[in-house]
Every structure is written in structure tokens, then in C-alpha cells.
């Protein structure tokens, strides 16, 4: 899977999980500040990313993933 395909899939997951429009999402968007996620939303989003990309994201890494860019970069690094 290319980085562009990963980005598109991450965007799609954010749209379905967070109920935001795709045009509201930018790579620098913060899940909590910009996309309105609370801590439970963020945990559920991380779990969905793990399932979608078949990766394990340890808690200490998940705590560092605060933006869309960080999520995409993390998944790309694990592919």
C-alpha cells in the first residue's frame, strides 16, 4: 500500500468514525482540537486504524499520535 493510499484510507476512517466531512480534514489537523475527538474517540480511532492496517499500536506510541499526519506517518513506517 502506498503512502497516498494509506492517507486516503485514514481519511475515510476519520470521516466514518468522527462524523466530519473529508474537506475538514487536513494533515495537520489535531484529533482533539480540530476534529472534536474526546479521549474515547481517539482510543476507538486508534483501534480502528490497527484493524484496518493490521498493525499493533502500543499505548506509548498511541499517546504520541495527535494529528492526522502522525497517524499516517506511523502506519507508513509499519508497512
From Swiss-Prot:
GO molecular function, one term: acyl binding
Organism of this sequence: Chlorobium chlorochromatii (strain CaD3)
Limits of the Carrier domain: 4-79
GO CC, any one term: cytosol
Processing after translation: 4'-phosphopantetheine is transferred from CoA to a specific serine of apo-ACP by AcpS. This modification is essential for activity because fatty acids are bound in thioester linkage to the sulfhydryl of the prosthetic group.
Protein name in UniProt: Acyl carrier protein
Family recorded in the similarity comment: Belongs to the acyl carrier protein (ACP) family.
Gene behind this protein: acpP
Lineage, highest ranks first: Bacteria, Pseudomonadati, Chlorobiota, Chlorobiia, Chlorobiales
Localization per Swiss-Prot or TrEMBL: Cytoplasm
Residues with the O-(pantetheine 4'-phosphoryl)serine modification: 39
Function text: Carrier of the growing fatty acid chain in fatty acid biosynthesis.
Keyword terms, alphabetized: Cytoplasm, Fatty acid biosynthesis, Fatty acid metabolism, Lipid biosynthesis, Lipid metabolism, Phosphopantetheine, Phosphoprotein
Annotated metabolic or biological route of this protein: Lipid metabolism; fatty acid biosynthesis
GO biological process: lipid A biosynthetic process
Domain of life: Bacteria
Pfam family, one: PP-binding
Amino acid at each position: 500500500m502506498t503512502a497516498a493510499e494509506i492517507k486516503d484510507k485514514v481519511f475515510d476512517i476519520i470521516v466514518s468514525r468522527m462524523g466530519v466531512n473529508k474537506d475538514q480534514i487536513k494533515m495537520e489537523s489535531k484529533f482533539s482540537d480540530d476534529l472534536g475527538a474526546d479521549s474515547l474517540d481517539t482510543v476507538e480511532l486508534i483501534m480502528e486504524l490497527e484493524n484496518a492496517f493490521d498493525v499493533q499500536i502500543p499505548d506509548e506510541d498511541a499517546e504520541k499520535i495527535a494529528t492526522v499526519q502522525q497517524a499516517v506517518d506511523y502506519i507508513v513506517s509499519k508497512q
